[in-house]
């Protein structure tokens, strides 16, 4: 399972609720929040699955 995070990080994310579960066992609100975190982690954060953890 993967998400295309090209074009990130973005300065602001919407409040859209489309949860993703990261490899850090944290639920991210949406793709934007998740991709920003992926960039911050230098690519060490990956997608565990779609939906809440």
From Swiss-Prot:
<dbReference type="InterPro" id="IPR002350">
    <property type="entry name" value="Kazal_dom"/>
</dbReference>
<feature type="disulfide bond">
    <location>
        <begin position="5"/>
        <end position="35"/>
    </location>
</feature>
<feature type="site" description="Reactive bond 3">
    <location>
        <begin position="15"/>
        <end position="16"/>
    </location>
</feature>
<keyword id="KW-0964">Secreted</keyword>
<keyword id="KW-0646">Protease inhibitor</keyword>
<dbReference type="GO" id="GO:0004867">
    <property type="term" value="F:serine-type endopeptidase inhibitor activity"/>
</dbReference>
<keyword id="KW-0325">Glycoprotein</keyword>
<feature type="disulfide bond">
    <location>
        <begin position="21"/>
        <end position="53"/>
    </location>
</feature>
<feature type="disulfide bond">
    <location>
        <begin position="13"/>
        <end position="32"/>
    </location>
</feature>
<feature type="domain" description="Kazal-like">
    <location>
        <begin position="3"/>
        <end position="53"/>
    </location>
</feature>
<dbReference type="InterPro" id="IPR050159">
    <property type="entry name" value="Kazal-type_SerProtInhib"/>
</dbReference>
<dbReference type="InterPro" id="IPR036058">
    <property type="entry name" value="Kazal_dom_sf"/>
</dbReference>
<feature type="glycosylation site" description="N-linked (GlcNAc...) asparagine">
    <location>
        <position position="42"/>
    </location>
</feature>
<keyword id="KW-0722">Serine protease inhibitor</keyword>
<dbReference type="Pfam" id="PF00050">
    <property type="entry name" value="Kazal_1"/>
</dbReference>
<keyword id="KW-1015">Disulfide bond</keyword>
<dbReference type="GO" id="GO:0005576">
    <property type="term" value="C:extracellular region"/>
</dbReference>
<keyword id="KW-0677">Repeat</keyword>
<protein>
    <recommendedName>
        <fullName>Ovomucoid</fullName>
    </recommendedName>
</protein>
